[in-house]
């Protein structure tokens, strides 16, 4: 009687699977990434892949969480300009290079939001959940950088700035994916200047109203 093969769950094996899936995803996309190819690239047997991740949807859901943890560590900075530079020049601009896997993956993840055919897909649901967490993370980073009097007058002002910043970043992800001839560093600075001007103008308006 053949012995049942036991697959050992280890952090090393799980990381190898996620690294392999990430490498495939940024070049082959969701549809083109298969569990068997993940097994081949990771050097692990097919059974080990399914032992860790029941199916491709669950694998991609975990991959999104994995990339989100990297994103949180990378998106830091003392000013709004630093944050936008990281989001636009670093993340969106960097996503054009498949070798920059953690950034390139977010182009694929954005497709989950755009493709309605995947409405019930677990990976899509995970991306939309993580997208909300990303938003709240940025709100927590941005609000302390806005003058207190502006937030007192409009408590949603910080969230509005994050909505604007995210819209800009999403647009630049598409530009990178399309291969547009864009100087991402230049446009990151232009975007930061625009956001800073909006904040400064609102603070100035409030100051004038107070002194009138």
Where are these regions (language model features)?
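Amphipathic alpha-helical segments used for helix-helix packing
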Residues: 100-125, 174
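Amphipathic alpha-helical interface segments
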Residues: 20, 24, 94, 168-175, ...
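Amphipathic alpha-helical packing segments from all-alpha helical-bundle domains
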Residues: 72-80, 101-104, 121-148, 160-163, ...
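Short Lys/Arg-rich basic patches
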Residues: 2-7, 13
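Helix-turn-helix
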Residues: 12-16, 20-58, 62
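Hydrophobic alpha-helical bundle segments that form small-molecule/ligand-binding pockets
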Residues: 90, 119-121, 132-162, 176, ...
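Hydrophobic alpha-helical connector segments
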Residues: 62, 73-105, 151-165, 188, ...
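Short, basic, alpha-helical segments at the C-terminal edge of helix-turn-helix-like DNA-binding modules
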Residues: 65-71
